[in-house]
Structure formats: C-alpha cells, structure tokens
Amino acid sequence: IKHLGKLHTLDLTNCDQITDDGIKYLGKLHTLNLTHCDQITDKAIKHLSNLHTLDLSCCDQITDEGIKHLCNLHTLNLYDCKNITDEGIKHLSKLHTLNLTCCKKITDEGIKHLSKLHTLTLFWCDKITDEGIKHLGNVK
C-alpha cells in the first residue's frame, strides 16, 4: 500500500488483516474506509489526521483517545463504535459531517459541542433527549 502515491480513495472494508502498522502509510489519502477492520486501534488513528473523509464504522477498538486526533477532518463515520463517549466527540467540533449511529454512550452533553456541523446522524442513540436536540437548533 505504501507505494500507491497517487491514490486518492481507499476502501478496506472487512480487511481484518490490516493492522496499525499498515495504516501509518495512508495519511496522505483523501478518503479512507476502515469499516470492520477489527485490528485497528487508537495508535493508528494519529496517522490519519489530515484525511478529508474517514469511515471507522464497527471498529470496536477505537476509543475517545484515538478520535481526538481527527478534529480537522471534514467527514467522519463512527457508526457502531461502542467505545466512543461524549469526551471523545467534544474534539470533533470542526467537522462538517458526523455519523454517530449506534454510539450508545453519546448523550446530550456530547452533542452540544457539535455546533458547526452541517450533517449529524444520531440513529439509535438512546441517550439523546429533547435537551440535546435543543442545542442542535443553534447549529451554525
């Protein structure tokens, strides 16, 4: 992978043999999909801070510690990332698009930090209440 210098977009969905060591070569991509890449950890995420779009759906080892490096992305998909909490998403306030579907630990407190988003997906986020939605009314 490290020899693909002109590559723009890479989809590695379900490539469960990809590890943190392989990810360090992908920081210059525009778009990267790592859905169900089960061996990817927070250690790899720091190499992806310059991407435009990143999909980490169902990457169970990703935590708040990893996503704090992703504050400059345009689009981030964290679908079913079970270890993401309010603490992690507060670092994502500059994003344009964020998917938090099935992120069961996200509460009203977390989404109030997301005022610059244009698109936010919160399907099956059971801890979001009217209070959290009220903050979204102030989205700029």
Show where each model-derived region lies:
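The feature encodes a structural signal of leucine-rich repeats
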Residues: 1-2, 20-24, 42-46, 64-68, ...
